Structure formats: C-alpha cells, structure tokens
Amino acid sequence: MAERINQHKNPIIGTNIVRLRKERNLKAIDVIAKLQLKGIYVTTGIFSKIEHGRNNPSVEIIIALTEIFECDFNEFFKCL
C-alpha cells in the first residue's frame, strides 16, 4: 500500500489538483486514465475525494500527477 503524506486532510492539495487539471483542459476521467497507464489504479470516487480534500493522495499518486501535469513539486504544493 502506498504511503500517505500525513493523516491530516488538506483541501489545498485537492484544489491545486483541480486547478492544474483544468489549466491543462483535462477531465477527471482523463487524469484517472493516465494514472492507470502508469499502473496506479484509482476509482473515480477516490479521485473525487482527493480533489475535494476528503482524501490525501499517496506519494505515488503525487509523483504521477506531477508527471501528468508536467509541473514541479513547488507548483503542485503551491499555497501550502
């Protein structure tokens, strides 16, 4: 099981994921498909919870999202 960053939920991470996704004109289902191509299987429900700040993404998911969004960690964690 992938390690969590911490146990405290942080809605800013989800907000940043939504912002980065929309800036790249991607739908949530597109990002989920790209994650699956990288061998990371998340359901639409889990991804929605991550975007809404109800679940923290694993380190594995964060790394994959920075690759999908072609951004660095500073951009990913902006405003934290």
Task: Tell where the protein language model's regions lie, with residue ranges.
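Conserved short acidic donor-positioning loop in nucleotide-sugar-dependent glycosyltransferases
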Residues: 79
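Helix-turn-helix DNA-binding elements, focusing on the entry/boundary residues of the two helices
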Residues: 17, 28, 44, 59-62
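Conserved hydrophobic/aromatic packing and binding residues within compact polymer-binding modules
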Residues: 17, 31-32, 47-50, 76
